[in-house]
Amino acid sequence: MPSSKDWGSTSILVASEAIPALRNANRTISPLVSGFVIVSPFPFFRFLGFLWCLYFVNRRHKAPFFELREIPCHYHRLDIPCCIIRPGKNTFSFHFHLDKKGTKAPTSS
């Protein structure tokens, strides 16, 4: 596992089970998650990754609505803050966890 200083300059985006072409990119991501996971200790890089995801998914899958939510770190066995982006049906919503230690359950929309 890279140190937290390395995450900002290395991989920002980790694909989970949502995109078939990227399905095998990282098996450490929980298979229960359907979407993208942005991994970075810095909010700025997570936001850039979020914008990139919107462009990528909207272009490839024609899905205009998304949900972005921050999840507890232990949810993916990571020791750094994470965000998850999932396709949404009728909403464009942001749900953030303030607890970086992962003691709260993920929020639902």
From Swiss-Prot:
Q: Where does the source fall among the domains of life? A: Viruses
> Mind telling me what this protein is named?
Putative protein p26
Organism of origin is Acyrthosiphon pisum secondary endosymbiont phage 1 (Bacteriophage APSE-1)
